[in-house]
Amino acid sequence: MSAPTSIPALDEASKKELESFLEQEQAKAKLQASIHELTNTCWNTCITGGISSKFSKSEAQCLENCVDRFLDSSLYIVRQIEAQKQQI
């Protein structure tokens, strides 16, 4: 086996660009994970009947409430974390 190819040292501008790109990709991944969690939680909680082309009235209302509560709790958590960061 040959030795791994060394990565040339990056200049500061390239490092910052790479760091910014990685932060954006991590944010996208976190958003996707939140959407997956939201979908899974609300689906399992609200969809009680069989699969059909339309949600029942109660399922639609449950889904709407579930999404609202999920978003409310997510925003609350973010605000609490930001408040804790400011106290440090």
Swiss-Prot record:
Pfam families: zf-Tim10_DDP. It is found in: Mitochondrion inner membrane. It is a peripheral membrane protein. Keywords: Chaperone, Disulfide bond, Membrane, Metal-binding, Mitochondrion, Mitochondrion inner membrane, Protein transport, Translocation, Transport, Zinc. One of its GO terms (biological process) is protein transport. One of its GO terms (molecular function) is metal ion binding. The keyword Ribonucleoprotein does not apply. Heterohexamer; composed of 3 copies of TIM8 and 3 copies of TIM13, named soluble 70 kDa complex. Associates with the TIM22 complex, whose core is composed of TIM22 and TIM54. Interacts with the transmembrane regions of multi-pass transmembrane proteins in transit. Mitochondrial intermembrane chaperone that participates in the import and insertion of some multi-pass transmembrane proteins into the mitochondrial inner membrane. Also required for the transfer of beta-barrel precursors from the TOM complex to the sorting and assembly machinery (SAM complex) of the outer membrane. Acts as a chaperone-like protein that protects the hydrophobic precursors from aggregation and guide them through the mitochondrial intermembrane space. The twin CX3C motif contains 4 conserved Cys residues that form 2 disulfide bonds in the mitochondrial intermembrane space. However, during the transit of TIM8 from cytoplasm into mitochondrion, the Cys residues probably coordinate zinc, thereby preventing folding and allowing its transfer across mitochondrial outer membrane. This is Mitochondrial import inner membrane translocase subunit TIM8. It comes from Cryptococcus neoformans var. neoformans serotype D (strain JEC21 / ATCC MYA-565).
